[in-house]
From Swiss-Prot:
GO cellular component: large ribosomal subunit
Disulfide cysteine pairs (residue numbers): none
InterPro entries in alphabetical order: NA-bd_OB-fold, Rib_uL2_dom2, Ribosomal_uL2, Ribosomal_uL2_bac/org-type, Ribosomal_uL2_C, Ribosomal_uL2_CS, Ribosomal_uL2_dom3, Ribosomal_uL2_RNA-bd_dom
Any GO molecular function: transferase activity
Gene3D superfamilies xrefs: 2.30.30.30, Nucleic acid-binding proteins (2.40.50.140), Ribosomal protein L2, domain 3 (4.10.950.10)
GO terms of biological process kind: cytoplasmic translation
Protein's name in the database: Large ribosomal subunit protein uL2
Entry similarity comment: Belongs to the universal ribosomal protein uL2 family.
Function field: One of the primary rRNA binding proteins. Required for association of the 30S and 50S subunits to form the 70S ribosome, for tRNA binding and peptide bond formation. It has been suggested to have peptidyltransferase activity; this is somewhat controversial. Makes several contacts with the 16S rRNA in the 70S ribosome.
Keyword Nucleotidyltransferase part of the UniProt annotation: no
Sequence ranges of Polar residues compositional bias: 39-49
Subunit description: Part of the 50S ribosomal subunit. Forms a bridge to the 30S subunit in the 70S ribosome.
Domain of life: Bacteria
Organism: Edwardsiella ictaluri (strain 93-146)
């Protein structure tokens, strides 16, 4: 893994910082594990914008990732690491002993030729997946399930991890990167180690066009709009003279948005404020 700072041969190259990984596969992805990935432009079925700042971008194919890791007792070997345009983490193509191939999230340190396994009998090493009741307290894990058999939901992006801090009966307590402490059923699975490609956070796109290649459109300030477009719009000066709100008039800057009260009982400690 190398961090490459481009020379300022043009204004668009001046600030570019790339993350180069020579271990990534340079050919085409494994075709049977690809699916069509249609772009929405941030619109719903009525044609209305439901998510702002989305549109354009390069065509992409979705890689079917195995978040469940449920082929117990069958060893697999890592064939190669690949780039995935749909996520910040890299992915690994693994070949199981029964001949099946699957994509998984590439754990930190995982490389071609490594052996991995899933199930209660799997060894305690990075890339292996076990129920959390079988993982030692203090271990760092990723791709963590929140319901048994549902597939990993927590800690899936580049460099992400969760730490197991306690085990109490049918639940384990996890410390998330946000500082939140949360109880999860001990039968839920997790993959040992951190997600790889942690250097992803160091990259600098360098120009607006690089964001457009990724399907990200500009973010316009509310104060730069007209009153018809945003509550902050209009006026002669730059001061909008009211509490900051979203384009729909909902208070922003610190307003709580969590509505899933049903699972509040599993949160031991709220996330720490920045």
């Amino acid at each position: 893994m190398a961090i490459v700072k481009c020379k300022p041969t043009s204004p668009g190259r001046r600030h570019v910082v790339k993350v180069v990984n020579p271990e990534l596969h340079k050919g085409k992805p494994f075709a049977p594990l690809l699916e069509k990935n249609s772009k929405t432009g941030g619109r719903n079925n009525n044609g209305r914008i439901t998510t702002r700042h989305i549109g354009g971008g390069h065509k992409q194919q979705y890689r079917l990732i195995d978040f469940k890791r449920n082929k117990d007792g069958i060893p697999a070997v890592v064939e190669r690491l690949e780039y995935d345009p749909n996520r910040s983490a890299n992915i690994a193509l693994v070949l199981y002993k029964d001949g099946e191939r699957r994509y998984i999230l590439a754990a930190k340190g995982l490389k071609a030729g490594d052996q991995i396994q899933s199930g209660v009998d799997a060894a305690i090493k990075a890339g292996n997946t076990l129920p959390m009741r079988n993982i030692p307290v203090g271990s760092t894990v990723h791709n963590v399930e929140m319901k048994p058999g549902k597939g990993g939901q927590l800690a899936r992006s580049a460099g992400a991890y969760v730490q197991i801090v306690a085990r109490d009966g049918a639940y384990v307590t996890l410390r998330l990167r946000s500082g939140e402490m949360r109880k999860i059923p001990a039968d839920c699975r997790a993959t040992l180690g951190e997600v790889g490609n942690a250097e992803h956070m160091l990259r600098v796109l360098g120009k607006a066009g690089a964001a457009r290649w990724r399907g990200v459109r500009p973010t316009v300030r509310g104060t730069a709009m007209n009153p018809v477009d945003h509550p902050h719009g209009g006026g002669e000066g730059r001061n909008f003279g009211k509490h900051p709100v979203t384009p729909w008039g909902v208070q922003t800057k610190g307003k709580k948005t969590r509505s899933n009260k049903r699972t509040d009982k599993f949160i031991v400690r709220r996330r720490s404020k920045k």
